[in-house]
From Swiss-Prot:
The modification Omega-N-methylarginine is found at R257. This is NADH dehydrogenase [ubiquinone] flavoprotein 1, mitochondrial. The modification N6-succinyllysine is found at K81. NADH binds at G87, R88, G89, G90, A91, G92, F93, P94, T95, G96. PANTHER family: NADH DEHYDROGENASE [UBIQUINONE] FLAVOPROTEIN 1, MITOCHONDRIAL (PTHR11780:SF10), NADH-UBIQUINONE OXIDOREDUCTASE FLAVOPROTEIN 1 NDUFV1 (PTHR11780). It comes from Macaca fascicularis. It is a peripheral membrane protein. Transmembrane segments: none annotated. Residues 1-20 form a transit peptide. The lineage of its organism: Eukaryota, Metazoa, Chordata, Craniata, Vertebrata.
Length: 464
C-alpha cells in the first residue's frame, strides 16, 4: 500500500513516540517469535473452518461487541492507544492517534471510515486472506473502529481483481445486517452504522488514501495535495479516516482482550502480532501470523521451510513488499521484523511481504522488473515521478544488459534521490527505494556486469 511510507525513512517524531505504551512493570522481553495458538487473532487464516457468521461466532467473533460499543469512543481509543497498534498498511503510524483525529465535535457533516482493501503491492496478499477466510473480523472491526471515531458508515474499497473475496465479504455483510449486528441499532447498542463495498478497477495508485477517496467519489484515481487531510476533508467532503484491513480487523480483539495484552507482544513501539507473507525462493510459501520483532531468519526457517538450497544459498530479501529496499544475507542473519529494526537496517517493514531470493536470482533483472511495474502504475501527475521513474526504467534496462558505464550508477542514485520526497504521494518513494537498495548492497554486481559486457563487445569487435 501507499499509505504515507515516508515515515519509514526515519524515526518517528518525538511528539508521537509517547503514544506507544505497554505494561511498564513487566520484565523487558529479549526474545520474540513462536506465537502460541491461543494468542492468534486470525484463527481461520487458511480457510479450514466455516467463514460465514455461524463459524465466526464459534471462533469468538461478535462476542460482547455490544458491551464494547456501549463503553464509548473514548474507552475504545484508550485501548487502541494502550495496545501500541501501528498501522499495518505500510506507514506504521500510531493507530490510536490517527483515529483520535476524528473524535472531535461534529460540525454537521457525517464522518466515514474507509477501509483500504486495494491490496496491489507486489508480494502482498495478507488482506486477501482476511477477506476470503475471516470476513466477519473485518466487518466487526469496521463497527468498532467506526464507533471509536463517531463514523456513520464504512466504505470497504476492495481491489477489482479480488472477485471471490468481494463476494465473501458481501455475504458476511448481509449476514451481519440480517442478524442485527450492523445497520440500525447495531448489536442493540443504539448506534447506527452501515457498511458498503466499493470495487476498484485495478489501479495500483488507488492504494494511496486520497487517490482511493477520489475513486470512491467516481473520479480518476489520482492523489490529492495535502492539506487538507482526509480527517478534515475526505470522502464526499466529509471527515474520513482511511485504514488498512488488518489494522481494522484486529481492533475488536484488542478491545476484548485488552490493550495491555496486545502490547505484550513485540518490542516497545513495535507491539502486537502481525501477518507476514513469505514468498519467493522458500520451500513452503505461506501467510502466517507471528509476533512482531520475530527474527527474519526464524520466520523464514520455521514457517516457510527455509530457503531453497539451504540458508547459505540466500542472496537477498525484500522484507516489506516491493517498495522497500532489499537487504543482503549478512543483514538477514540478525535483523528483527519490526518497524524500527528494519529502519535501522536501511529498509522498512512496509506490508511485511517477505520476498526471498536465492543465489539463482538475477538481482539486477529482478529490481528492473519492479521499476517497470512502478513506471506502468504511475498516475503521471507529478513530474519527478512521471519522468524520473521512466528514466530509471531505461537505465535499469541497460544495467540488465550491462550496456552502461560505471558512472551511470551514481547518476541513477541521484535520479532516485530527486524522485524521493518530491511527489504528492509515496509512489515515487516506492520506486526509488528498490534502486537505492540495489546500489547500496550490490554495486559490485552492477560493475562486474558492465565489465563483462565490455569484454564481450571487445571480443566481438576483434573477431570481426
Amino acid at each position: 500500500m501507499l499509505a504515507a511510507r515516508r515515515l519509514l525513512g526515519g524515526s518517528l517524531p518525538s511528539r508521537v513516540s509517547v503514544r506507544f505504551s505497554g505494561d511498564t512493570t513487566a520484565p523487558k522481553k529479549t526474545s520474540f517469535g513462536s506465537l502460541k495458538d491461543e494468542d492468534r487473532i486470525f484463527t481461520n487464516l487458511y480457510g479450514r473452518h466455516d467463514w460465514r457468521l455461524k463459524g465466526a461466532l464459534s471462533r469468538g467473533d461478535w462476542y460482547k461487541t455490544k458491551e464494547i460499543l456501549l463503553k464509548g469512543p473514548d474507552w475504545i481509543l484508550g485501548e487502541i492507544k494502550t495496545s501500541g497498534l501501528r498501522g499495518r498498511g505500510g506507514a506504521g503510524f500510531p493507530t490510536g492517534l490517527k483515529w483520535s483525529f476524528m473524535n472531535k465535535p461534529s460540525d454537521g457533516r457525517p464522518k466515514y471510515l474507509v477501509v483500504n482493501a486495494d491490496e496491489g503491492e507486489p508480494g502482498t496478499c495478507k488482506d486477501r486472506e482476511i477477506i476470503r477466510h475471516d470476513p466477519h473480523k473485518l466487518v466487526e472491526g469496521c463497527l468498532v473502529g467506526g464507533r471509536a471515531m463517531g463514523a456513520r458508515a464504512a466504505y470497504i474499497y476492495i481491489r477489482g481483481e479480488f472477485y471471490n473475496e468481494a463476494s465473501n465479504l458481501q455475504v458476511a455483510i448481509r449476514e451481519a445486517y440480517e442478524a442485527g449486528l450492523i445497520g440500525k441499532n447495531a448489536c442493540g447498542s443504539g448506534y447506527d452504522f452501515d457498511v458498503f463495498v466499493v470495487r476498484g478497477a485495478g489501479a495500483y495508485i488507488c492504494g494511496e488514501e486520497t487517490a482511493l477517496i477520489e475513486s470512491i467519489e467516481g473520479k480518476q484515481g489520482k492523489p490529492r495535495l495535502k492539506p487538507p487531510f482526509p480527517a478534515d476533508v475526505g470522502v464526499f467532503g466529509c471527515p474520513t479516516t482511511v485504514a488498512n484491513v488488518e489494522t481494522v480487523a484486529v481492533s475488536p480483539t484488542i478491545c476484548r482482550r485488552g490493550g495491555t495484552w496486545f502490547a505484550g507482544f513485540g518490542r516497545e513501539r513495535n507491539s502486537g502480532t502481525k501477518l507476514f507473507n513469505i514468498s519467493g525462493h522458500v520451500n513452503h510459501p505461506c501467510t502466517v501470523e507471528e509476533e512482531m520483532s520475530v527474527p527474519l531468519k526464524e520466520l523464514i526457517e520455521k514457517h516457510a521451510g527455509g530457503v531453497t538450497g539451504g540458508w547459505d544459498n540466500l542472496l537477498a530479501v525484500i522484507p516489506g513488499g516491493s517498495s522497500t529496499p532489499l537487504i543482503p544475507k549478512s543483514v538477514c542473519e540478525t535483523v528483527l521484523m519490526d518497524f524500527d529494526a528494519l529502519v535501522q537496517a536501511q529498509t522498512g517493514l512496509g506490508t511485511a511481504a517477505v520476498i526471498v531470493m536465492d543465489r539463482s536470482t538475477d538481482i539486477v533483472k529482478a529490481i528492473a522488473r519492479l521499476i517497470e511495474f512502478y513506471k506502468y502504475e504511475s498516475c503521471g501527475q507529478c513530474t519527478p515521478c512521471r519522468e524520473g521513474v521512466d528514466w530509471m526504467n531505461k537505465v535499469m534496462a541497460r544495467f540488465v544488459r550491462g550496456d552502461a558505464r560505471p558512472a551511470e550508477i551514481d547518476s541513477l542514485w541521484e535520479i532516485s534521490k530527486q524522485i524521493e520526497g518530491h511527489t504528492i504521494c509515496a509512489l515515487g518513494d516506492g520506486a526509488a527505494w528498490p534502486v537505492q537498495g540495489l546500489i547500496r548492497h550490490f554495486r559490485p554486481e552492477l560493475e562486474e556486469r558492465m565489465q563483462r559486457f565490455a569484454q564481450q563487445h571487445q571480443a566481438r569487435q576483434a573477431a570481426s
